[in-house]
Amino acid sequence: DLETIQFVSKIDKIKFYKNKLTNVTDKKKKYKISFWINPTLGPNEEKSSRYLLSEYFENLNAIVIRNVYNIDFSGVSVFLSSTLPISNVSIDRIIYKSITVEIELEPNETKEFSFMLGTAIGKEELNKIIFNYNQDKVIDKEYQDVVKYWDNMLNTIKVKTPDINFNYMMNGWYLYQTIASRLFARAGFYQVGGAYGFRDQLQDSMNICEV
């Protein structure tokens, strides 16, 4: 049984996949779990894939991907890492890049671990971000900070109507969607969008004036 919580750091450019794995059988089990992405690092996959340089760094416990052809973003790296030691990597395939970890569990035993997907500019920032978040206890604290941050912000305004579904959407969800997908980013897993025009920016900003 695998439970996964996804969230993004409030400060650093890193996304976490916080996992809880349980052996629900009555036998000792050894699991291999892979985390993979299909990187583009450019305008489209067809033009960018041939210029991607992927490297595995054992000291970082991470694979690092760069677009060596892109002059404007030549110093930008994308990395995949884990709080568990990486046992295998796939970096020579054009379609995807992956890391694999191994876990051994006794019957009904549970272990927690995380995968990380992040980006950095230059080696110094890359090393700093990876080393800052290479422990589960640090990621747990980051998760609690993120939850507290959004709870404080989204509880600023509350509505109460006879329609439970309307209350659910208005009390947190719509506000979160506007801030996360329109102001803090330009896309969301559940709703891709966010225009750059003045009118679009204005109407998005007006929605959160009271927050």
Segments from the language model and where they lie:
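Polysaccharide-binding surfaces and accessory modules of carbohydrate-active proteins
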Residues: I5-V101, E124-T156
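Active-site catalytic microenvironments for nucleophilic, acid-base chemistry
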Residues: R66, G118, V211
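A structural detector for beta-sheet-dominated domains
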Residues: R66, E106, K160-P162
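Short Pro-Gly-centered flexible turn/kink motifs
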Residues: K29, I103-I121
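Active-site-adjacent structural elements in folded domains
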Residues: D1-F7, S98-I99, A185-G193
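Substrate-binding groove/exosite segments of carbohydrate-active enzymes
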Residues: D151-V211
